[in-house]
Amino acid sequence: MQSKTFSVLSSCLLLIATVQGQLSGSVGPSTSISDKKAVKTCNVLDYGATNDNKTDVGQPIMNAFEDCGSGGVIYIPEGDYLIQEWVSLRNGTAFAIQLDGVIYRNGTTTSQGYMFGISGGSDFELYSSTSKGAIQGSGYLYHMNGEFTAPRLLHISDVSHWSVHDIALVDAPMFHFVIDDASNGEVYNMAIRGGNSGGLDGIDVSGDNIWIHDVMVTNKDECVTVKTGSHNFQIENIYCNWSGGCAMDSLGSGTNVSNIVYRNIYTWNSNQMYMIKSNGGDGEVSNLLFENFIGHGNAYSLDLDSEWSSMDTVDGDDGESRPPIRVICPEAIPCTDITIEDVDLWTEEGDSETYVCKNAFGSGACLKSDSSSTATYATTTTVTSAPSGYSATTMAADLTSAFGTDASIPIPTIPTSFYPGATPYSALAGSS
């Protein structure tokens, strides 16, 4: 549903319950790169790889892991590499992968699964010392033929104390980066760029105590999205640059999400600024903080929807057709303790906008205050004048058009700014 324009948001604070939002402990690898290099460096060129974009690099990486997976650095020097054998590294400890080259998917390979998978183990780091390392999935070779069930790029599963940073993930045939049941991790200084179609998710994450910051995503589906089984996340300085937008979704049976912070989220020409999607199921979502959102040209702004179902594109591109604030909760189990404040929204088309609330209690927008009442409700509030502070800045790197699905997508340069006025927490590795 990524049609043209919707609204502009200058600042938004949404608070559910009382969380201040934070990590529960330290994140990132337990030992430094220099410590790992002091143990051993395994250059993939010594294990049969060649940087000619013709010879498979997958098996040489796995061979290098045999020597460096229990302590050391697997080094992929600058140059172009072809991957035909998908990489699966299991239960490594105190090791890193220094990806300074570019890995290209073999266009004739029909294997599914993840091109690059790290599972189990601890104290792991995937990074580029030049900030120019990348994985190029060449997904357009699938997409131009209408195929979207295809390989994914990067998977981190059940790993503790880890980081991924200073690399680009480009044109995934399916998902770009999936984090499953990982803990104490950090993701930063990344650029993810995919085609303009659903199912090409940027980052999907579940686990405990994870910090994701200073990341740019371009696609038409999830930007940075939290999945069930997520706790103690801090997600900030995120640049959804012509994307699907950030979300919390696939919340079905056994939902269990708590202590999640989204802060400093800039959303340009996307489906939504933030959406929580569910339809039935059971479980609990609690203690969420959404703070400092800026958006331009988005189809939806804040959409908490417990009646989500597949929808056709909504006609119209104004705030009356697409409510910028929409909080829809179940009749049997309403949402409580929601605070919406300091919100400045206005439509880019038309002269009015609506807020829609249903069985949601708290303060702000169209919420009802009395959650002790057993009466269900649904209400629509119409706003006919622009708030005084709704105008917001833009970013210099805002895209003027999406990338299609029938041509190669260029590898982007990782930006040095991900949110207006916010300095990234870490300088690019390649800047030193």
From Swiss-Prot:
Keyword Hydrolase: yes
Compartments (UniProt record): Secreted
Glycosylation site residues: N53, N91, N106, N241, N256
Cystine connections: C42-C68, C223-C240, C329-C335, C357-C366
Function: Pectinolytic enzymes consist of four classes of enzymes: pectine lyase, polygalacturonase, pectin methylesterase and rhamnogalacturonase. Hydrolyzes alpha-D-galacturonopyranosyl-(1,2)-alpha-L-rhamnopyranosyl linkages in the backbone of the hairy regions of pectins.
Assigned EC number: 3.2.1.-
MF GO annotations: polygalacturonase activity; rhamnogalacturonan alpha-L-rhamnopyranosyl-(1->4)-alpha-D-galactopyranosyluronide lyase activity
Pfam families, alphabetized: Glyco_hydro_28
Gene giving rise to this polypeptide: rhgE
Keyword presence, Hydrolase: yes
Keyword tags: Carbohydrate metabolism, Cell wall biogenesis/degradation, Disulfide bond, Glycoprotein, Glycosidase, Hydrolase, Polysaccharide degradation, Secreted, Signal
Signal sequence segment: 1-21
GO cellular component: extracellular region
Enzyme class: hydrolase
Stated family: Belongs to the glycosyl hydrolase 28 family.
Single GO biological process annotation from the record: polysaccharide catabolic process
Active site: D221 (proton donor), H296
Protein name per UniProt: Probable rhamnogalacturonase E
